[in-house]
C-alpha cells in the first residue's frame, strides 16, 4: 500500500483531499496530514512516504522549500504541488526542483486522482529498472 502525506496550511483544503478521494481503491493510505512544511519534514523523517501532495504557499516553510528538503531525505519520493496562484514561476520552480506535477486550485479531484495514478505508475516503472 502506498503511503501519502498531505501538506496544506488550510485545514479545509487538506481535509478535502483526504475525504474526496477513495484512497483504498488506489491502494494507498494517508499516513500524515501536516499544516506546515516543518511538521511535514519531521513527519517524513519518522515515517517515510511515497507521495507528497502539498500546497506551495504556507507560513514557516513553503512548499517549494519543503519539497527540496523532502527530496534530500528521500530522492525517490514523488511530489505534487498545488497552489491557488496561477503564477507560471511557481510551476517552473516546482518542476525544476524535481516535483512530479503542479496543479492549480480550486482542485478538480478527478484530475488529482489521475495525477496520483500517474505518480504510482511512475513508481512501478522505477521498480522494474
Regions inferred by a protein language model and the residue ranges of each:
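Conserved acidic segment of CheY-like receiver
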Residues: 2-13, 17-18, 52
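A generic structural motif
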Residues: 25-31
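Residues at the starts of beta-strands that form the adenosine-phosphate
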Residues: 3, 30, 78
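Conserved Asp/Asn-Gly motif in the active-site loop of CheY-like receiver
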Residues: 31-38
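CheY-like receiver
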Residues: 41-129
